Amino acid sequence: MSEIITGLTTKEKLNILADAAKYDVACTSSGVDRKGVKGSLGNSVSCGICHSFAGDGRCVSLLKVLMTNHCIFDCKYCLNRRSNDVPRATFEPDELCDLVIEFYKRNYIEGLFLSSGILRDPTYTMQKMCETLYLLRTKYRFNGYIHVKTIPGASDDLISMAGYLSDRVSVNMELPTDESLRKLAPNKSFTTILDPMGKLANTIGAHRIAVGKSEKMERSGINRYLAGSIFNTDHSTDCRLGDRGVDNYSLIPGSSGSSEKTVAKPADGLLPVMFHDLDRRRPFAPAGQSTQMIVGAGEETDYTLIRTAQTLYQNYDLKRVFCLLYTSDAADEE
């Protein structure tokens, strides 16, 4: 694995980390309508309405970037895997905040999409991402749209914090079956992915009820009226996929999985301040959560992909299940 390059300018880091994020799918309607607030910067009303799309799928109205493309994992389908010889860089929280604000002031972007490789361990990486979001919302008074991809295996407190500081959260499903996950992403498991996904779904539902909304996310168009919709749990068909599918690993939202997690240390960086100052009256991920699956890396049929998506929609009330085409450009030749 290449070492992180030191002495890079912010522009050089941006070139590396924006390019490294191009295989993350983020482009969709934001799902929130928060208006501008006096004394704050930005709003989320127009996000998701006037997006432009680059040829490689990037959404140009969001700054789509990684916190770091360093990664301790070696997922065979990933450009940033440990064994791949690519330039590595890492943003510091304040450095990334400055970049977001300057881009926003120049009307380049309407918001931020933040993902990351894994530096040291999942909790350390998630802490750096939360520090960035916390500084944006407090020090920089940024009120625009934020979509953050959480890191499976990070501490529950930090994943929860990300929900309070962002508009949409994601936990990448990665692959539709356990067999493919074991083969192509041996450091990951359905348990470490579905556990935070379930807890996020539970918290989102509780916050929606607290403000007088239905527990489930609203669906648009004809999906609100179709009894047999893919989202409708009351009229669902059998979603089980045998021994390999997600339904056999589904955790009840809010339940505790058996995954090992590193714990955030109270004295680390901004953690004490963030936990103390976090405004839990803020809406929790008001635009819901989404996920992403790689399609074509394993031997799954279209039927399996659709059934997996249906199970995720019904069990975790996801707003979107994105499918990203497997590409040899990012893949391990093995």
Regions found by a protein language model. Name each.
Residues M1-H70:
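Flexible, acidic/Gly-rich N-terminal and inter-domain linker regions that tether
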Residues H70-N80:
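Local cysteine-cluster metal-coordination motifs and their immediate loop/turn environment
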Residues R81-L96, Y104-M129, L135-D156, G163-L270, ...:
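Core AdoMet radical
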Residues V100, I159, D302-A309:
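Short, acidic/polar
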Residues P152-G153, G296-R307:
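Active-site glycine- and acidic-residue-rich loops that bind
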Residues A285-A287:
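Class I SAM-binding transferase module
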Residues A309-L318:
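A conserved active-site cap/scaffold subdomain adjacent to cofactor or substrate pockets
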Residues Y326-E334:
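Conserved small/polar residues in nucleotide/adenosyl-binding loops
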